[in-house]
From Swiss-Prot:
SUPFAM superfamilies: FMT C-terminal domain-like (SSF50486). It comes from Staphylococcus aureus (strain NCTC 8325 / PS 47). This is Putative 3-methyladenine DNA glycosylase. Belongs to the DNA glycosylase MPG family. Gene3D superfamilies: Methylpurine-DNA glycosylase (MPG). The lineage of its organism: Bacteria, Bacillati, Bacillota, Bacilli, Bacillales.
Amino acid sequence: MDFVNNDTRQIAKNLLGVKVIYQDTTQTYTGYIVETEAYLGLNDRAAHGYGGKITPKVTSLYKRGGTIYAHVMHTHLLINFVTKSEGIPEGVLIRAIEPEEGLSAMFRNRGKKGYEVTNGPGKWTKAFNIPRAIDGATLNDCRLSIDTKNRKYPKDIIASPRIGIPNKGDWTHKSLRYTVKGNPFVSRMRKSDCMFPEDTWK
């Protein structure tokens, strides 16, 4: 997948259904991306790169597309895939995963079962046992990788405003969150909107 030359919003959509693999020292975790958010850098008031601000915590966001930008929010580790050329702080937040391999270990790591295991940006990273130290690594050149060949394809994609970013003017309401329609592993899904996971893919 080209993380440098494509539009960040298109990358966020294209990532839906892509297989994520994390290889721990003793365990392999896999799953399929069902929810993403695009962050558009310098002009995006909700983005960590808004206005070109650079601090030690966001250094990875300014690296070349395909870099992993990992940051902690309210004790939860959030994983972003950096997009664009070096120096342009855009990226895609991976918000939720439909789990596949390593379920028993995920249950232990999270202390939860069912859809709660991976239906949020800090939930799936804990389920996959991903460490903060992965920040700045290059996707597919470290323990975290994606598989764009053995992937799934959503039947429908929904675009909606991003989660948890009030008071950012127009950027609060822009539809930059992308979800696999009806997939129960999407965060904040109403039960009435849920479908069986297998029915949400082509």
